[in-house]
Amino acid sequence: MSEDLSMKCGLEIHVQVDTNSKLFCQCPTNYKDVEPNTNICPVCIGHPGAKPMPPNKKAIDMAIMVAKMLGCEMVIDKDIYFQRKHYNYPDLPSGYQKTSVPIGEHGTFLGVGITEVHLEEDPGQYKPDLGTVDYNRSGTPLIEIVTDPDMKSPEEAREFLRQLLRLFRYIGNLRGEGTMRADTNISIKYNGIQGNRVEVKNVNSIRGVYKVLKYELIRQKNVLRRGGEIKLETRAFMESQMITKGMRSKETADDYRYIPDPDLQPIVLSNDWVEKVEAQMPETPMNKEKRFVEQYGIKEDDAKVLVSDLELADVFEKVVAELGNDKDGISLAVTWIRNELKRVLVYNKIEFFETNLKPEHMVELINSIKDKTISQKIGKTIIEQMVEHKGEKTPKELISEMGLTVIEDTSELEKACEEAIKNSEKAIEDYKSGNQRALNSVVGQVMKLTRGRAEPGTVVEILKKKIDG
């Protein structure tokens, strides 16, 4: 019997703004670098009578920028006030969280509707297993992005988050996946039976969101298949087991007892304010990808790979400019940045910015290959060493240290070719019988004998002269 199964998913994504001070006080936000409960003040820890400062302007600017880049309509010339969202949990000493009404609404990103974007304060960090709370994080500015329930599969949600995090990297001043948290809301329809919405709180990685949705899809389907009912509830993600566990029945807005915060004046966004922020907005990844294809004439797949890493995209443009911005320069930059450098980054599981490589390093390497100081094979070795040495050594220094310059002494090359011919009787026979590709294995032998220091074109010429007589 065939199954009729569909799902709807919406996300509430929380991303920290990288400010020096917290949202409502002057305490620093570097909570990971200090001892527990040191970056705190009466405002952070909710002392009665402690009055918050006006909200951090940089945090507001970043919320405006995120909302604009997600295509939201801005809330202009209206009071944007902060509310007190009441709930009891050890990480929230005041008993309420300060959270704004929407700054932007009705946007869209990758075909997914954006319900709203607003600002709020991060709570502290509670460790139930130890019974400890660290309030250093309390009050750090958070931007919350609420989506419509438009995602139809775990894969779609995963791709949405990947692209959203890429956008955050382009925007800058936002902390990435390490601090991002998402609440996932999922409901399914199974053989005509509609289940209630389930929320899974505080999932802190893209992989986690994907696993939660896969698990909930199967769990909810099995409940409905057995004739059960999906409860309207909030669940927790048990990351070590990759499962979810019931926490409590789902809250409504009334449960949070929202009231305007009497200690904070409303924000009023003007057109001038929004336009000033817009003027500082970076090029989006999607626009950069399109421009790379049009401006440099490269393939869409190559543009996608380059643009996936902002620093990699920047170094590509700088290298192309140094190489002359012509067809050959672009082709070499694609080969050595998109293909070879990216290969090494993926193998080492690092991002470009972690390598400390500079554009001039890549230009020096490519020029060494262009002028045949080194072979392409050696170029691959050098790029691996450049990454391993974290940019501390230039390509020329590495080439010199490792003795990897191309062999220019013809007699040395001829000697290597003669030895390769002697050890490749079958390949020589096949070549003489008309199989041109058989020569490749002989060339490979020469490259091995010379540790990749031979120029392949020169090797082929010498081999043909010696074999063809």
Curated annotation (Swiss-Prot):
E.C. code: 6.3.5.-
GO BP of this protein: glutaminyl-tRNAGln biosynthesis via transamidation; translation
Primary enzyme class: ligase
Domain of life: Archaea
Oxidoreductase as UniProt keyword: no
Sorted UniProt keywords: ATP-binding, Ligase, Nucleotide-binding, Protein biosynthesis
SUPFAM superfamilies: GatB/YqeY motif (SSF89095), Glutamine synthetase/guanido kinase (SSF55931)
Catalytic function, reaction form: L-glutamyl-tRNA(Gln) + L-glutamine + ATP + H2O = L-glutaminyl-tRNA(Gln) + L-glutamate + ADP + phosphate + H(+); L-aspartyl-tRNA(Asn) + L-glutamine + ATP + H2O = L-asparaginyl-tRNA(Asn) + L-glutamate + ADP + phosphate + 2 H(+)
A single GO molecular function term of this UniProt record: ATP binding
Protein purpose: Allows the formation of correctly charged Asn-tRNA(Asn) or Gln-tRNA(Gln) through the transamidation of misacylated Asp-tRNA(Asn) or Glu-tRNA(Gln) in organisms which lack either or both of asparaginyl-tRNA or glutaminyl-tRNA synthetases. The reaction takes place in the presence of glutamine and ATP through an activated phospho-Asp-tRNA(Asn) or phospho-Glu-tRNA(Gln).
Oligomer and partners: Heterotrimer of A, B and C subunits.
Family per similarity comment: Belongs to the GatB/GatE family. GatB subfamily.
UniProt-recorded name of the protein: Aspartyl/glutamyl-tRNA(Asn/Gln) amidotransferase subunit B
